[in-house]
Swiss-Prot record:
It comes from Phytophthora infestans (strain T30-4). The active site is at D132 (proton acceptor), H160 (proton donor). Coiled coil: none annotated. GO terms for cellular component: cytoplasm. One of its GO terms (molecular function) is GTP binding. This is Adenylosuccinate synthetase.
Length: 551
């Protein structure tokens, strides 16, 4: 057995235990460490001992955010309505520890699926707010270590802007991982694709020097967004009048509607063009019957796809099989999320949402990937909040601070060019997003935008008629009528864009990050301090740091 590894993991666990309340909790940690030691012993022949030892230590640290809360706040875990005893809180924590240790044992049983950290199995990057959090920037950075990058939901309504080697790239359908010259990029079955826009995006990338040939694949099961869908999108928005949703008018909703009505056309249909033509004629007739003002021309649209079908079919494959074969072959797969959790058709602020599921479930339904193949789930959180279009926004600002955030943060939509609404970071919303997705790590982006503010605030609770709300209300009127409780913290004036370590940040900025981490109970691993791909601080987890140092 690698006793040095086990002893380091044990010492790290003991140091963490010393910070926790109650002898039972410390005893449980000792027992958990023993289980971890046995895991190391069992995996000796198949896996590096250090890897399992580190996993063990990290599992024990997984509840650090809960342990650091005060008694009353911690008692709220497990959905308790009233403060409960420390012993009950400890039991809730231990449930988390057991869950994480079971994952370690799964790693031992399936050593080909697990190593240190990310890059094993399927990792996922998801927006945790209302979009525009900076997902593309992290994907651009992480993708250099992955073999396959895949999108699983949404369409050209999504937009990523990335500054890469001094050039600004704008992505809508193509995964931003295409900037990794060694990666294969996939548009999964859950994406709806406007093929003319897709080809235009590829041509723009080619003009900027990106060689995508042979590296971009489209699912034969992906549904197509047609020009008539975009026209219908605009008509629907006009019909809503003052109840407009704020759609991007990219045809996303109508395309998903066709999918659910089972009269849509899929990319793979282009292989059998006579059938495709018949489906197109029927679809145009269906929409003209329901939208007399529609100007769609079936023959003209069929001609467009006849001209491009060969080029598209060269990129079209069964991506479900491709992804799962890549997984079995040990390829590193990264899912690049589009839109965000609060725009999810089921979990977002309905009806002011998108028409797909840009939360964790879309990885399975939009990529054909089994949930037991998922590894890291990374939530992207802007250091403040933004939203494009209509819909409730509890922490929205209409003052000089809101103007500062919009101006300094260059908050204009990549897809629409519309100015984004800005506000303070919303913890109740983030806790809800964290609950839905089960984030393993967070990336806090655009911390530099808060520079120059004398005071910064964090929305920590919603109140309605004198009562604190539990969770995120599904009723929009209740959400709109709620009052946000804020915590105020000191701001900072120092330029942080050149900071490379957490310790280099101003003390006030460090306190802000740590407070957000404490409130969410999830480790903030990455901190964005500027627009470039390298303007990111990577934080070592406290227990991982203790383990590596061996102190």
């Amino acid at each position: 057995m690698r006793l040095d590894v086990v002893s380091k993991a044990a010492r790290a666990a003991q140091r963490f235990s010393a910070q926790c309340h109650g002898q039972k909790f410390r005893t449980a940690h000792a027992s958990a460490t023993l289980r971890a030691a046995l895991a190391v012993e069992a995996s000796e022949a198949n896996q590096k001992g250090r890897s399992a030892g580190l996993l063990a230590a990290m599992a024990l640290m997984g509840v650090a955010g809960v342990a650091s809360m005060d008694d009353n706040a911690a008692a709220k875990c497990e959905g308790a309505a009233k403060p409960v005893s420390r012993e009950a809180v400890t039991q809730a924590m231990l449930k988390e520890v057991v869950t994480k240790l079971n994952r370690i044992e799964s790693a031992v049983a399936n050593p080909h699926r697990h190593t240190d950290g990310l890059n094993v199995g399927v990792d996922v990057v998801l927006g945790a707010q209302w979009g525009d959090e900076g997902k593309g920037k992290l994907v651009d950075s992480l993708s250099q270590s992955y073999d396959v990058i895949v999108r699983v939901a949404g369409g050209s309504n999504a937009g990523h802007t990335i500054v890469h080697e001094g050039k600004k790239y704008k992505f809508h359908l193509v995964p931003s991982g295409i900037l990794n010259p060694n990666a294969i990029c996939i548009i999964g079955n859950g994406v709806v694709v406007h093929l003319p826009s897709f080809l235009e995006e590829l041509e723009e990338l080619k003009r900027m020097g990106v060689d995508y040939e042979g590296r971009i694949l489209i699912s034969d099961r992906a549904h197509m967004v047609l020009d008539l869908h975009q026209e219908v999108d605009g008509i629907n928005e006009l019909r809503r009048g003052r109840n407009k949703i704020g759609t991007t008018k990219k045809g996303i909703g109508p395309a998903y509607s066709s999918k659910m009505l089972r009269n849509g056309v899929r990319v793979g249909d282009l292989r059998y063009f006579d059938d495709f033509t018949e489906k197109m004629v029927d679809l145009v007739k269906f929409y003209k019957d329901n939208y007399p003002e529609l100007e769609a021309d079936a023959e003209a649209e069929i001609k467009v796809y006849s001209d491009m079908k060969d080029k598209i079919l060269d990129m079209t494959v069964d991506t479900v099989s491709y992804l799962n074969n890549a997984y079995v072959a040990g390829k590193k797969i990264l899912v690049e999320g589009a839109n965000a959790t609060m725009l999810d058709i089921d979990f977002g602020t309905y009806p002011y949402v998108t028409s797909s599921n840009p939360s964790i479930g879309s990885v399975c339904t939009g990529g054909g990937i089994s949930p037991n193949r998922l590894n890291g789930i990374i939530g992207i959180v802007k250091a403040y909040c933004t939203r494009v279009g209509e819909g409730p926004f509890p922490t929205e600002l209409h003052d000089d601070v809101g103007e500062h955030l919009g101006t300094v943060g260059a908050e204009f939509g990549t897809t629409t060019g519309r100015a984004r609404r800005c506000g303070w970071l919303d913890i109740p919303q983030m806790r809800y997003s964290n609950m839905v997705n089960g984030f393993t790590e967070l990336n806090l982006t655009k911390l530099d935008v808060l520079t120059g503010l004398k005071k910064v605030k964090i929305g920590v609770a919603y109140w309605h008629e004198g009562k604190k709300l539990d969770g995120m209300p599904s009723n929009l009127q209740l959400l709109q009528d709620s009052v946000v409780e804020y915590e105020e913290m000191e701001g900072w004036s120092e330029d942080i864009s050149k900071c490379k370590t957490f310790e280099e940040l101003p003390v006030a900025a460090q306190k802000y990050v740590l407070r957000v981490e404490e409130l969410l109970g999830t480790h903030i691993k990455w901190i964005g301090v500027g627009p470039d791909r390298f303007d990111v601080i990577t934080r070592t987890h406290p227990l991982e740091k203790a383990y590596i140092s061996g102190n």
